[in-house]
UniProtKB/Swiss-Prot annotation:
Annotated PANTHER family: 60S RIBOSOMAL PROTEIN L12, LARGE RIBOSOMAL SUBUNIT PROTEIN UL11M
GO MF annotation list: large ribosomal subunit rRNA binding; structural constituent of ribosome
SMART domains named in the record: RL11
Keyword set includes Ribonucleoprotein: yes
Gene Ontology biological process terms in this record: translation
InterPro entries for the chain: Ribosomal_uL11 (IPR000911), Ribosomal_uL11_bac-typ (IPR006519), Ribosomal_uL11_C (IPR020783), Ribosomal_uL11_C_sf (IPR036769), Ribosomal_uL11_N (IPR020784), Ribosomal_uL11_N_sf (IPR036796)
Protein name listed in UniProt: Large ribosomal subunit protein uL11
Cross-referenced NCBIfam families: L11_bact
HAMAP family the UniProt entry points to: Ribosomal_uL11
Keywords: Methylation, Ribonucleoprotein, Ribosomal protein, RNA-binding, rRNA-binding
């Protein structure tokens, strides 16, 4: 087995799927670690091509020899909830002013999508986490 490469940095970014480019925020974050920015952009865009329109968080591990690998996460729950409710943004005063609503089935569907990134053992608990996010955004769960 090859010796493990030494990790020099971990970068977390949220980028539109298929739209990574060397402009900020991507360029400066990667440039600071000496990563080949265009190489990352091409790899990320190819990996997220089928998810266009979503924001896809990515965790980039940078190694001592300036090589890198990245792990894609699921889109943020807040973005998925806004899309399900058909809204542009959440409420400014979430507990007094509701801006939209989602059904429990939609919440479970989002929980299913987010399951691998959530700290939950089953779909019911995952749905509770997503419902809490919805409430904090001013979206009513019916």
């Amino acid at each position: 087995m090859a010796p493990k490469k030494k990790v020099t940095g971990l970068i977390k970014l949220q980028i539109q799927a298929g739209q990574a480019n060397p402009a900020p925020p991507v360029g400066p974050a990667l440039g600071a670690h000496g990563v080949n920015i265009m190489e990352f952009c091409k790899a990320y865009n190819a990996a997220t091509e089928n998810q266009r329109g979503n924001v896809v968080p990515v965790e980039i591990t940078v190694y001592e020899d300036r090589s890198f690998d990245f792990k894609l996460k699921t889109p943020p729950a807040a973005k998925l909830l806004l899309k399900a409710a058909g809204l542009q943004k959440g409420s400014g005063v979430p507990h007094t002013q509701k801006v939209g609503s989602v059904t429990m089935d939609q919440v479970k569907e989002i929980a299913q999508t987010k399951m691998e990134d959530l700290n939950a053992n089953d779909i019911e608990n995952a749905a509770r986490i997503i419902a809490g996010t919805a409430r904090s955004m001013g979206i009513e769960v019916k």
